[in-house]
């Protein structure tokens, strides 16, 4: 029998021999695995001014032993990594400690997750909802057996990714992604008075959606429910974030392996009222999945923004250059502050440890050599923002021979990755609403690039793996650029 100490020792040994910190593609201000593979953000919570980011973690990748990794930060920019918090060391999670969330309860924090077990002889899957507790966020105690031992009747064992929160009436609620026996996706709601005995309330329904979500893909993963205030109206709305597998809407976008969408309404009981069947993709880039909202604690600032992290990765796409160069793969997005604007989700980068400052352009975009951002010369990890007005297209060039092409004009964003080392490259075009290209913010952190347009109304995340040094940034084209600000992280 393998003991917990053996699982921990294996993970720590893999970390001790890691090449990742020496890899020039390893990010400086994005959460990335100390070694091996990272995927979904898990258990995000801020306690006492410290931000805790847990994550799906396979330190011995490609050996498929899934732990929860653990990183902390005081400023969301500099991250410290700790020993794995959840080990796959019991029957209930022998085939992986899968995704979940965190909640503060009195003097301790509970990490809720899905335990995955697959019978080695029959291949039959067991999915259970499990909990780990901690009073200091350094030592973690696992409860055995699992709290919810199986899925309700009418659903397959694709029953996972619990989000747990305290409702306004003092009870606790849980939201889970599920697959019905007819192989369609849904979200289930549970309720409890003590976090240990749960009653299934039923599926979340959409009475005003005209059946739009009744057979919407074959599985809903990573559901998150978050309440956001609309900047235009001051009205608070509930936003359901889901990753529906198996949908192919006949419209622009939805080009990744699986999408991530937001549905806006008002949760009353199990009904998301006012959701009319419309939905939006949260990120139009090549790499974005399994986002999670960060939970608050009693010590959290009530005026602090609602934060979201995403996984900058896709299912089944682990063939990134960093596997060869550093023995690691994937990372998080930067934290994003969420609001609504006229019923649409707005996401702005939130990096208090990397504040923008006024920057200088050397030359003008219309010059033959373009305009270089003086403060970012030689930098491979930076943040840049500016306003633009267009008479033609504006090109953003990172380094001189990076192979990455970002082109903006009044109605379109074009990102061409075909010249980079990114294996799932090619060219992606995003149609923009009027005025969205007038405000631009770009985060570039060695091998990940995030583009924010329209003050957060359009977001594009991609892994870039540039050619050559990929240092500094130059703006060129028929556009006027003003209000430039920047900061380097290296």
Task: Give the predicted meaning of each segment.
Residues 1-161, 166-215, 229-283, 301-303, ...:
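Beta-rich carbohydrate-recognition and catalytic domains
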